[in-house]
Amino acid sequence: MQAAWLLGALLVPHLLSFGHGARGHGKEWEGVWGGALEEERDRESLMLKNLQEALGLPTGVGNKDNLAENSEGKEVWEATETQGEEEEEETTTTPSSSPTPFPSPSPTSEDTVTYILGRLASLDAGLHQLHIRLHVLDTRVVELTQGLRRLRDAASDTRDSVQALKEVQVRSEQEHGRLEGCLKGLRLGHKCFLLSRDFETQAAAQARCKARGGSLAQPADRQQMDALSRYLRAALAPYNWPVWLGVHDRRSEGLYLFENGQRVSFFAWHRALSPESGAQPSAASHPLSPDQPNGGILENCVAQASDDGSWWDHDCERRLYFVCEFPF
């Protein structure tokens, strides 16, 4: 009997310490601790029963004393557990409180100088990069300026070449016109006359003659006038066509000039037949019969009739045949 009691006294503290250790580790499972405690008690009772059976001791021996011992151990364990929980709550609550902020150190004069020097170094590096980029841009601008200058020089050379070609073309056309005028027209001394069967105003006719290296015909004397009359009559017979000459009084009424600006000293104006000559006057029946010039300021350009070679004043905007004169 005493041996059973002694064995129980020796085993119960170890079992309680085992249970306490299990409960200590069970802090992590606070949500399921109630069920675990009951299981622990059943496990202790089962272990004690198995030990008694293994030693051949009666099962009921020492139950009352063991129960008292277990009650005392339970009270001690619960007190220890309660104290551990309070300590854990204090430990858990303490970190949750707001930590006391550490005072930040105030910057010293050395820190300020270091900061300023650092900023100055950064600005200097940025300025250096800007200088590099500016140098690259300056180089690029110089290259572009040189390229633009070369392009301008090339364009100027091209314009000069085009102008030279135009001048050559004009001279070629003028030379061709002079040759054509002398080959196809009438050659008279140092002049050649060529009839054009295109209808043009007096100004347009002068422009076309000039483009071919000549001007509208300017007969300077009776010999040239008679030769030109024969040429026109032969070219346009049997019809009578007025043909523009290079004579006008646009500058001043009654002051007739050639296209080259020289004053006209020889005239071949149309005159109506007089009754004394035995011919029947035609002033009443033919609009071209009155003496010329008779248009005043409305008719300032001179045309030559192809049938008799007489001069008539006409409106400069009329479109007539024209005869060009070329130097030979």
From Swiss-Prot:
GO terms for cellular component: cytoplasm; extracellular region; extracellular space
Occurrences of domain C-type lectin (ranges): 188-325
Chief localisation class: cytoplasm
Biological process (GO), any one: ossification
Segments of this protein annotated with the region Disordered: 58-111
Endpoints of the signal sequence: 1-21
Changes after translation: O-glycosylated. Probably sulfated on the O-glycans.
Any GO MF annotation of the entry: growth factor activity
Localisation: Cytoplasm; Secreted
Alphabetized InterPro entries for the sequence: C-type_lectin-like, C-type_lectin-like/link_sf, C-type_lectin_CS, CLec_Tetranectin-domain, CTDL_fold
Disulfides per UniProt: C209-C324, C301-C316
Pfam family, one: Lectin_C
Role summary: Promotes osteogenesis by stimulating the differentiation of mesenchymal progenitors into mature osteoblasts. Important for repair and maintenance of adult bone.
UniProt name for this protein: C-type lectin domain family 11 member A
Protein source organism: Rattus norvegicus
